[in-house]
Design a protein with these regions (language model features):
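Acidic/hydrophobic-patterned starts of short beta strands in beta-sheet-rich repeat architectures
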Residues: 102-112, 163-166
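Repeat-based blade/solenoid architectures
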Residues: 85-94, 145-152
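Beta-propeller fold detector
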Residues: 135-142, 202-206
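Beta-propeller blade repeat segments, especially FG-GAP/WD-type strand-to-loop junctions
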Residues: 70-79, 120-140, 192-194
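Acidic, small-residue rich beta-repeat scaffolds with periodic aromatic anchors
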Residues: 4-8, 17-58, 147-209
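Short, solvent-exposed loop/turn segments at conserved positions within beta-propeller repeat blades
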Residues: 64-66, 117-120, 180-185
């Protein structure tokens, strides 16, 4: 039996994740069969998705109201304070829950894309601290990282795959139009690690195909 590499698994499951998201509400009927228990509703009034971490009472209600993102945690022992973010100029694509640092407590990640032709991706994420409270997760900007930003012009896709965060985007060569990138796809895999002032997503592997 052929052994599947972490890159192949990430690419495969990301494709499944994005295809599932594109199907909209039809896929939500089977959400309880997935590892992440979710309830999602997208309407003209905004985005609403409830995520519960399997085997625990910890959950997050992710919603929008106007240009505000609202994250309401529940099941934490110390603080379940509501979290607010101004998302003017962005649209929420999806939200996921998972345990990226394998500490038995979840992270909640919300994926956004900028309005306009570039569709630059953005992550708003939180990590649970020993079941007591949450702190924000930091994802360095692709545009600020010279090791991976060559040919980057947005159109990001993001997903949690097991305990890895994956981000991929088309690579543009000089002269490419926005609608026709010719440089293939760059996929970045991150691990969640403890930083000096909080948890950060650190690049673990970069693959182009």
């Amino acid at each position: 039996m052929k052994k599947i590499s972490s890159f192949e698994l990430c690419a495969l499951l990301m494709s499944c994740s994005f295809n599932k998201n594109e199907k909209g509400s039809a896929s939500d009927t089977t959400a309880k069969e997935d590892m992440n228990i979710t309830k999602q509703e997208v309407s003209e009034e905004g985005f609403n998705k409830e995520l519960t971490y399997p085997g625990s009472k910890i959950s997050f209600m992710v919603s929008t109201k106007g240009d505000s993102l609202i994250i309401q945690p529940s099941g934490l022992s110390v603080s379940n304070e509501t979290l607010y973010h101004d998302i003017t100029g962005y649209t929420i694509v999806n939200a996921e829950i998972g345990d990226l640092n394998v500490d038995s407590y979840p992270e909640v990640f919300i994926y956004l894309t900028s309005d306009g032709s570039g569709s630059y991706g953005k992550l708003i994420g939180y990590s649970v601290n020993n079941g007591k409270s949450v702190s924000q997760v930091y994802l360095p900007e692709i545009s600020e990282n010279n090791e991976v930003n060559k040919g980057y012009m947005g159109h990001d896709e993001m997903a949690i795959v097991e305990n890895t965060f994956c981000q991929r985007f088309p690579v543009y060569k000089e002269g490419d139009s926005n609608a026709n990138p010719t440089g293939g796809t760059r996929q970045i895999q991150y691990k969640l690690v403890d930083g000096e002032s909080g948890r950060i997503l650190k690049i673990d592997k970069v693959v182009e195909f």
